[in-house]
């Protein structure tokens, strides 16, 4: 699943190609995604100019004067801009999993592809931050509202694992399975430790590790494991620097002990039994 760095990489690739462009039409070939594509979406967005391409958590926000298109890539979704197309339709024929085309006045086309169809498109005419998908989300990991003190305060009395705790989007957004494992390794915290038994100093270290890991992943263009490529088709390269994720049995880069794998909160988890306590 594309996580925050992958979605931010997509946003950065799309913004200069879409901002200031007028939408001339929308084709929906498959409306049955995680939630059905709103029947009125093509009419609502046609004629609108995309003012900004933003991100909130793992959602892309295409802001126009009339409303905001909120898009989630789901498990395997991707977006790419096909340049210089014929008027009225994308010149590149759609493939089996190309479900939505957004046509632009300069002849280009934004194409949404989703083999597993777990993504979604929504139209919001009010403040998108108040939309039911977004209004309960926690702070962004790079916001000043996110720090170790917040983690420590919200974790008191919680018996859930610290890994599940930092993956809770109500606590902080964008820390998915890959980056939770990597952040906990950097902070030296065992992923199965109860969240309420992690002290303030360690939470401050963990908050810093989360920011570092996510910033490095964004700079590397995300992590390509199976489905993800950036909007220009290039893979992400953060996978080349993973310390524990997906490395069961390999030596820890710090202490040399074998990386272990176990399921925590229904998710595969990797950690070093020597470095993480």
Curated annotation (Swiss-Prot):
Function recorded in the entry: Involved in base excision repair of DNA damaged by oxidation or by mutagenic agents. Acts as a DNA glycosylase that recognizes and removes damaged bases. Has a preference for oxidized purines, such as 7,8-dihydro-8-oxoguanine (8-oxoG). Has AP (apurinic/apyrimidinic) lyase activity and introduces nicks in the DNA strand. Cleaves the DNA backbone by beta-delta elimination to generate a single-strand break at the site of the removed base with both 3'- and 5'-phosphates.
Transmembrane segments: none
PANTHER family registered for this protein in UniProt: FORMAMIDOPYRIMIDINE-DNA GLYCOSYLASE (PTHR22993:SF9)
Source species of the chain: Alkalilimnicola ehrlichii (strain ATCC BAA-1101 / DSM 17681 / MLHE-1)
Family label: Belongs to the FPG family.
Keywords: DNA damage, DNA repair, DNA-binding, Glycosidase, Hydrolase, Lyase, Metal-binding, Multifunctional enzyme, Zinc, Zinc-finger
Name of the protein in its database record: Formamidopyrimidine-DNA glycosylase
An example Gene Ontology biological process: base-excision repair
Database matches in NCBIfam families: fpg, PRK01103.1
Details of cofactor binding: Binds 1 zinc ion per subunit.
Zinc finger feature spans (FPG-type): 243-277
Gene: mutM
Subunit structure: Monomer.
Residues the entry annotates as binding DNA: 97, 116, 158
List of catalytic residues: 2 (schiff-base intermediate with dna), 3 (proton donor), 58 (proton donor), 267 (proton donor)
Record EC number: 3.2.2.23, 4.2.99.18
Cofactor(s) annotated in UniProt: Zn(2+)
Catalytic activity: Hydrolysis of DNA containing ring-opened 7-methylguanine residues, releasing 2,6-diamino-4-hydroxy-5-(N-methyl)formamidopyrimidine; 2'-deoxyribonucleotide-(2'-deoxyribose 5'-phosphate)-2'-deoxyribonucleotide-DNA = a 3'-end 2'-deoxyribonucleotide-(2,3-dehydro-2,3-deoxyribose 5'-phosphate)-DNA + a 5'-end 5'-phospho-2'-deoxyribonucleoside-DNA + H(+)
GO molecular function terms noted in the UniProt entry: 8-oxo-7,8-dihydroguanine DNA N-glycosylase activity; class I DNA-(apurinic or apyrimidinic site) endonuclease activity; damaged DNA binding; zinc ion binding
